[in-house]
UniProtKB/Swiss-Prot annotation:
Any Pfam family matching the protein: LRR_At5g56370
Residues annotated as domain F-box: 8-54
Species of the source: Arabidopsis thaliana
InterPro entries reported for this sequence: F-box-like_dom_sf (IPR036047), F-box_AtFBL13-like (IPR053781), F-box_dom (IPR001810), FBD (IPR006566), FBL60-like (IPR055294), LRR_FXL15/At3g58940/PEG3-like (IPR055411)
Gene3D superfamilies: 1.20.1280.50
Protein's name in the database: Putative F-box protein At1g21990
Length: 465
């Protein structure tokens, strides 16, 4: 009892600012219950720096007390001593649009810096008053529908640096454009539209002179008309993460781009020309090759220093890129492998990257085709010309997910025997501890076999991650 009383006194004797920080680590509805302890604790809740106002009740059980809880908690923002800077508001039930919007206005008018607004039910958001001079980070997610007039001066959030838009349906394309342009100092934009249950909400355009980081996930296979034209007018962009089905045409202004991460998805299964037959009815893969074109996208990222490609991207670039540009500035290339996707474009990528220093490959097993070139061992040695690896300047090779199979070992042998400038090889061995009862010995067998492979570079050292 004495120890408990001392601990209780230590907490109660702490300064209000410390207690406010402690309460900030608790869910808001738990922190709010401390107000019944004493008058002092009742005055501590305004000292928390974040509010989590979320409905986490099981589906079908409407939280009748949630609106009252939200309104009483948001009233804390009116206190002069309030230090609340971050608010997460998530509504799973309908509580009336006027009430919902009054909550939003309260948050925006009280100097909050970070606002996460989320709803699984459709709510209209009046854009004329959807504005804040202090907000730095904003996430709007779910069934929200911004519509109405622009704020005075056309500025929504003059201080906003980071904006995340997740499955939000704007009233029209102009409203979306105005919303982004209404954030004049925006540095990072995240657009996520990948849910067939809702129609696409992105018009394929991003225009902002200030954006430095752009992440887009746009995956609507049932809406090909939304993938016709993609336009990036982002002269300050340094980082691009783009995932979506390949479009018909790309246009961009991205002269500052340094790093790109691409996950280009095909509309149909792509077929090599040497695998096509004469029974062609005018539709399918060859029709896709005529109607979709990744050339513009690849050309506009050709100045990057770092490039990451998914396994789908490898095949899309091979089949739907008419001209491979020179990647003169590329220092690091990484790509993923898949047993259903080929490496046909890898030799061309390596030959187009004369200054490449680091090569990262996630998985060595890929689809065997007659057109994989000489970056791998898919074709017989006697039919190969000079290996593209011989002229490659790669100094660091990193392999992730190495399982030590016969095919993987042959591929590693091919790399080590041809990469003349190689200095460091980093390998992350993958052993299934659940299925392998002798995982430790399996790991040693894999690593020992790899260490015994001959190396053309006398400076090459192998490290295991």
């Amino acid at each position: 009892m004495h120890a408990q009383r001392v601990a209780r006194d230590l907490i109660s004797g702490s300064p209000d600012e410390i207690l406010g920080k402690i309460l900030s680590f608790l869910p808001t509805h738990h922190a709010a219950t401390t107000s019944v302890l004493s008058k002092r604790w009742r005055n501590l809740l305004p000292l928390v720096d974040k509010l989590e106002l979320t409905e986490d009740h099981p589906s079908g059980r409407c939280s009748l007390g949630f609106p009252d809880f939200v309104e009483k908690t948001l009233a804390l923002l009116d206190r002069p001593c309030s230090v609340i800077k971050k608010v997460h508001l998530n509504c799973d039930h309908l509580h009336g649009e006027s009430r919902f919007y009054s909550w939003i206005r309260t948050v925006l008018e009280r100097g909050v810096l970070d606002f996460h607004l989320e709803s699984s039910r459709m709510y209209r958001v009046e854009t004329e008053f959807f504005t804040s001079n202090t907000l730095v980070e904003l996430t709007i997610s779910g069934a929200l529908y911004p519509e109405g007039e622009l704020p005075p001066g056309g500025l929504f959030f003059p201080a906003l640096k980071r904006l995340s838009i997740v499955l939000v349906a704007f009233a029209d394309c102009d409203m979306y454009d105005d919303f982004v342009l209404g954030c004049p100092v925006l540095e990072e934009l995240i657009l996520y539209y990948a849910d067939d249950d809702q129609p696409p909400g992105w018009n394929g355009k991003v225009s902002s002179p200030s954006i430095k980081r752009l992440t887009i996930s746009h995956d609507y296979p049932d809406y090909p008309e939304t993938h016709i034209y993609v336009w990036f007018d982002t002269p300050s962009l340094v980082y691009l993460d783009y995932s979506g089905h390949v479009a018909r045409r790309y246009t961009a202004e991205m002269g500052s781009l340094e790093e790109a991460r691409l996950n280009l998805l095909p509309w149909e299964q792509l077929i090599d020309s040497d695998e096509e037959d004469d029974d062609f009815d005018g539709y399918g893969p060859r029709w896709e090759k005529r109607s979709k074109d990744a050339t513009g996208l690849i050309a506009m990222i050709s100045n990057v220093k770092t490039l990451h490609l998914s396994s789908d991207s490898l095949e899309v670039i091979h089949s739907l890129c008419k001209v491979m540009p020179a990647f003169q500035n590329l220092l690091k290339l990484s790509f993923e492998s898949d047993k259903e996707r080929g490496w046909q474009v890898v030799p061309l990528l390596l030959n187009s990257s004369p200054n490449l220093e680091t090569l990262v490959i996630k998985g060595l097993v890929h689809k065997v085709t007659s057109r994989c070139g000489d970056a791998c061992l898919c074709i017989r040695k006697k039919t190969r010309g000079e290996c593209c690896l011989l002229t490659c300047q790669v100094k660091v090779l990193k392999i992730i997910g190495y399982r030590g199979t016969c095919r993987e070992q042959k591929q590693m042998s091919h790399f080590l025997a041809n990469l003349k400038c190689l200095e460091t090889v980093k390998v992350r061995v993958e052993v299934d501890h659940r299925e392998d009862n002798d995982a430790s010995n399996t790991y040693l067998r894999i690593t020992n076999a790899l260490m015994k492979l001959p190396r053309v570079s006398s400076n090459c050292r192998i490290h295991f991650l």
